[in-house]
């Protein structure tokens, strides 16, 4: 009962008191999605070296699979899972998304580039690479594109200059530009917000990731970047043999976002540096169940 009162008092997006159970269920479903990173072992491009490819996936098969198996229509594609950036492939992929009654929320661009490089040739090459991916995201009719502002130790000034150019290009394509706490110079949340503010706060948004900050500082760091979030990467990391998430309190992360007034979509994701033998469909079920319960 306390949660229902809280939502009513704060004008929370769910408005639990005012919605029927059916409408509330639809509302929470519209705010839950999933990326392709969790099933990286089933993609030829990202499976562990030397491992057998079992039950393979491609981006072309993801939209229907996610709708049928997980009842998920909000999608996020990882750049490493694209087979091509050719127009014919992208058009076919866009049609698969549409045919499944799905929608592409974000493209995570992790190609080889460094927008904070002090080497001007490298910075210009990186800008050209990023523009190619923005073109692809626009052709796919993605709702947004995530670009990394620069590697750890890079130049903040070069990153700002680059992100200004990237943002101008995104504006031409009518694409929101997202920056995630993703192991570059933006891992300092104050630097992250400085880059956003200097490069284009009207179109540049944060993409808070539950699992990327050190656990000791994650709550404070997430709280700083959450007010500027467009979507949230609802990441789980390590699980024990009983299928319990052991890295941090996943539900607390969602509740932190809700208390901060976040009204957007949570994109479920799992990533760990440990070699774990997991049933990733069950992990996906666990994350989606937690999100649907918490919203």
What are these regions (language model features)?
Residues 2-134, 138-139, 171, 201, ...:
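N-terminal pre-domain/capping segments
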Residues 71-72, 137, 142, 229, ...:
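A structural motif
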Residues 34-38, 77-81, 106-111, 147-149, ...:
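A cross-domain feature marking catalytic cores of carbohydrate-active enzymes
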Residues 78-89, 114-117, 150-157, 182-189, ...:
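Acidic-and-aromatic substrate-binding clefts and catalytic sites of carbohydrate-active enzymes
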